[in-house]
Amino acid sequence: MASAQAETNVGLASEQGPVAQRQRKGTGSGADSPKSNRSSPTQQEEKRIKSEDRTSPTGGAKDEDKESQGHAVAGGGGSSPVSSPQGRSSSVASPSSSSQQFCLRWNNYQTNLTTIFDQLLQNECFVDVTLACDGRSMKAHKMVLSACSPYFQTLLAETPCQHPIVIMRDVNWSDLKAIVEFMYRGEINVSQDQIGPLLRIAEMLKVRGLADVTHMEAATAAAAAASSERMPSSPKESTSTSRTEHDREREAEELLAFMQPEKKLRTSDWDPAELRLSPLERQQGRNVRKRRWPSADTIFNPPAPPSPLSSLIAAERMELEQKERERQRDCSLMTPPPKPPMSSGSTVGATRRLETAIHALDMPSPAATPGPLSRSSRPHSQSPQQQQAQQQGQLPLPLPLHPHHHASPAPHPSQTAGSAHHPASPAGDSRFPLGPAAAMAAARELSGLGPGPSAEPRLPPPPPHHHGGGGVGGGGVGGGGAGGVGSGGGSSLADDLEIKPGIAEMIREEERAKMMENSHAWMGATGSTLAADSYQYQLQSMWQKCWNTNQNLMHHMRFRERGPLKSWRPETMAEAIFSVLKEGLSLSQAARKYDIPYPTFVLYANRVHNMLGPSIDGGPDLRPKGRGRPQRILLGIWPDEHIKGVIKTVVFRDTKDIKDESLAAHMPPYGRHSPAFPLQDLPLSYPGASGALAGAPSSMACPNGSGPQTGVGVAGEQHMSQETAAAVAAVAHNIRQQMQMAAVPPGLFNLPPHPGVGGGVGNVPGAAGGRASISPALSSGSGPRHAPSPCGPAGLLPNLPPSMAVALHHQQQQQAAHHHMQQLHLQQQQAHLHHHQQQQQQQQQQHHQGGHQVAHKSGFGASSSSSASSSSMGQHHAPKAKSSPLRSETPRLHSPLGDLGLDMASYKREFSPSRLFAEDLAELVGASVSSSSSSAAAATAPPERSAGAASAATGADAPSSSSSGGIKVEPITTTSE
């Protein structure tokens, strides 16, 4: 700066501009020239102009004076700074100006300069310093920063770096930006709530115009003197200052004797970019031994998620670590010699001495840091020695292990004595609350998780800072002492625990990088690897494990055996198919509208179309759609009830029947789901099962199509032993699954596969009739899948879903005797009549019961199912007697269903939730809930309806099943075996 001395007047005190230039052209320093031409008119005029200017926007006369003074000194001025206007004008008068001189004035010079500087800032032209905070950075000009802040002036003067990066801690990005704008423009607009923090930071950075910088001026003067001593601009200057410097040097040497080994270090050893300088940082830096200072920041401010700057800094830091390690060996750690407590008067002197000493070492001066300076000077700032002793008294000795720097020890009484004294540690400083990062560091240190093994142990506990009047009284000296030395206890420990810094640093970086990769950066914010690994990492992995487990469970519990998860709800699918049939949307339109994958939608629509059977308008084409002709579904006309029944069967079978029937029990809406389903009560008695209960094989066969056997078995074993029942249930469950897999003949689309098919059609005709005819809903549920060919019981039975089979068997068991007889006859008849009758019944049911009948629709299944549902209901209500025994037993049976919580038996007619589903469906499909209710009614009024079914069902409960749908259950259907 000394070299720029002449310019200081020009650049900084605008009114001196032209004059200063003239002065430069003249002999040089006007103050020394005897001939200064004070009376010349021009000079008078200049004087006048100057005094006017002194009130210029930059801040009033007082500020101007301060500025010129500070800068003149900073320049190392041969010309003593004169603060009186006359002095100033005289200094500009050129001694040799015998000829008249003219003042050339640039009126809007100041505004122009301001504008230009602002433009340079915006365009980042000629920038030579980077300010960073909060992970963001902005480039600025050293000259402007120095002009506006003695803090920056000192800082940048000490940093012999082309383009230093100043990392501000505990500074908000918005505040920093505003302050820099203020320095460049002289004014900013801020909201009210921003003013407080802004002024706090301005105070910290000693920004002229926003903060009182008088305290800094003295320090700056000392700094300037020291720097001018290093690079004297003229021999005369150096001699003038040398004596005082010499004295200062001697005092400083006493102060810094304990740093002796390091005294050899010169700034060249420090890479200035490495000095991460921020006011608070430097304050805290004093706590750390000097050689450790550069990376002290890593300790106090645990690495935040890496910013572009931090990687550079880390690399440089690693090189430094090597040098530091060697240095460390030389630096014997000893506490500074105790000094008698200084009175506040001597504080400033001490400050200066310390400062110059530090300058002599080319070390960044802690004193220059604008620590919060308490205005009231301390009555007695204690010497570093005392402070450290005090601190060690306060902090238990284990502390050096993980220094809780920021946990401020209970302030020592002496500290609290002085008014406005800041508590022992910077963290405690009320005016400078820790930023989030520092707070985190404090917390981490408290919890013993240091940012890394190497950095921590090396920090001796910081001596409490006492900020005395001069700004450095006890604070500076104490800080210096602590910085260089560390407390005795801490030092030995620190050295014992030391890990080679370079290595530790590398390890830390590596861990951090690994963490960033592994944790997708969401744990990256915790600088502490330990913390992340131990807590967040575990949390995350636990969460993932749970997620995976749940996914697997979901897969297993899906109702579909294979294929990806569905992205659509069955209700949506039902609506979409219905809209194709009724609104004439094309398949692709409907798929888009309802957001169902097109191929899936075509699959379901085709299935529905196939099951709808011939269209009312007599369209001739019954063949399944040819490849690439899915749209044919649009051509037919079918009764709404019929359509809804088929849709329920096709669409809801997937979702609602666990492996078909197993879930079916839960679904009231379909026949088998309808609450009326006694079948469900008999859950495990398979049609085959009931018959099979006695003769499992034969009964199983029955469900598959040997009606007579089933019937017989059923009759015989209505009350099987639980063990048998369980065994049968298991077998039945397997068979059920197989049956589910069976192809569904298109003709059977209407069959409620379970009810009609298994029970009604062939196997358990009687039983099925009563119960086997699962409620139409049931049949509809499984119908599509199971619907066997309309032709025969055999076909039907194989398709029976397991639940259907169960239902059939239970019914069979109850009605077994009658059913056997009927089943035999009926089976034969069924083959021929069943299909037609059921279809008729289905249609009737559709009309009568809407949804319910739809369920029944399935050809043979229909009548049987309706009768079954009624009978089952009857059983539940009245006949419950029979069904309930089974039912009560069933839960005990160990069937796969039971494990799934799907025990069929458990669903009793009374179970109203079953009706809920019916209602939902009805809403969806537009069918009235009556269908389900009708089946319930049938069950309730089994005796009346049973007329047809009674004979068919011949079971006690069978009668009720006769017309659950309002359809007469024909004995054939009931017996349908």
From Swiss-Prot:
Record-linked SMART domains: BTB
UniProt gene name: bab1
The keyword Transcription regulation is assigned to this record: yes
Function: Probably acts as a transcriptional regulator. Required for the specification of the tarsal segment. Also involved in antenna development.
Biased segments, Low complexity type: 80-97, 372-396, 804-816, 838-853, 862-872, 925-966
Gene source species: Drosophila melanogaster
Tissue and organ expression note: Leg imaginal disk at the central region of the tarsus and in eye antenna disk at the basal cylinder.
Biased composition (Basic and acidic residues): 44-69, 316-330
Keywords tagged on the record: DNA-binding, Nucleus, Transcription, Transcription regulation
UniProt DNA-binding residue ranges: 569-614, 621-632
Residues passing through the membrane, by range: none
UniProt-recorded name of the protein: Protein bric-a-brac 1
BTB domain mapped to chain residues: 127-192
Pfam families: BTB, HTH_psq
Polar residues composition bias: residue spans: 34-43
Compartments where found: Nucleus
